[in-house]
UniProtKB/Swiss-Prot annotation:
Its job: This enzyme is a serine protease capable of degrading the native triple helix of collagen.
Domain Peptidase S1: 1-20
UniProt-recorded name of the protein: Collagenolytic protease 25 kDa II/III
Keywords: Collagen degradation, Hydrolase, Protease, Serine protease
GO BP, one annotated term: collagen catabolic process
Gene Ontology terms, MF aspect: serine-type peptidase activity
Swiss-Prot/TrEMBL catalytic activity: Hydrolysis of proteins, with broad specificity for peptide bonds. Native collagen is cleaved about 75% of the length of the molecule from the N-terminus. Low activity on small molecule substrates of both trypsin and chymotrypsin
Entry keyword annotation includes RNA-binding: no
Length: 20
């Protein structure tokens, strides 16, 4: 996860959505 925030479900889902 890019950033200093906690790896919340919504955060990693958003990251994966941007990654694919």
């Amino acid at each position: 996860i890019v950033g200093g925030q906690e790896a919340t479900p919504h955060t990693w889902v958003h990251q994966v959505a941007l990654f694919i």
